[in-house]
Amino acid sequence: MSDEDHDFSHQGGGDNASKTYPLPAGALKKGGYVCINGRPCKVIDLSVSKTGKHGHAKVSIVATDIFTGNRLEDQAPSTHNVEVPFVKTFTYSVLDIQPNEDPSLPSHLSLMDDEGESREDLDMPPDVALATQIKEQFDSGKEVLVVVVSAMGTEQVLQTKNAAEK
């Protein structure tokens, strides 16, 4: 399920808002999202076994954690509900990169959205190659756009974008 397949308007707000919603396992689609072991994951493969003597077809799910990239697998009867995370993506311009006082910790990012709202609560991504790419683009004076993904109470920079792709 792509983001276009979901209506996120019923999510609600605040800390008490649900971070997931139920969906029958048989309705999952490749490219959609699912929670496995309490982690938000993107489905990379699905297979459905035939109905057995106990009456339920089983859905085998192979997915990757959207924040760590770890591969996870799960199975569920096709008629049973699985938890699907609300996943939102945002694009921000990088205004500044501030080194952390502790060099063993990631630098902080100053970001601005399309409406001019700024935020300074995100760190550089843990992916060293991505963090290096952001820093090099920023240091060269180019406009750096980052894509932030939010799911299940976690937000993280997952990629960069060219300003022309905005």
Swiss-Prot record:
It is found in: Cytoplasm. It holds the Pfam family IF5A-like_N. GO terms for molecular function: ribosome binding; RNA binding; translation elongation factor activity; translation initiation factor activity. SMART domains: eIF-5a (SM01376). SUPFAM superfamilies: Nucleic acid-binding proteins, Translation proteins SH3-like domain. GO terms for biological process: peptidyl-lysine modification to peptidyl-hypusine; positive regulation of translational elongation; positive regulation of translational termination. CDD domains: S1_eIF5A. InterPro entries: IF5A-like, IF5A-like_N, NA-bd_OB-fold, Rib_uL2_dom2, Trans_elong_IF5A_hypusine_site, Transl_elong_IF5A_C, Translation_prot_SH3-like_sf. Keywords: Cytoplasm, Elongation factor, Hypusine, Initiation factor, Protein biosynthesis, RNA-binding. Lys-53 undergoes hypusination, a unique post-translational modification that consists in the addition of a butylamino group from spermidine to lysine side chain, leading to the formation of the unusual amino acid hypusine. eIF-5As are the only known proteins to undergo this modification, which is essential for their function. The modification Hypusine is found at K53. Its main location: cytoplasm. Residues 112-121 have a biased composition (Acidic residues). Belongs to the eIF-5A family. This is Eukaryotic translation initiation factor 5A. It comes from Leishmania donovani.
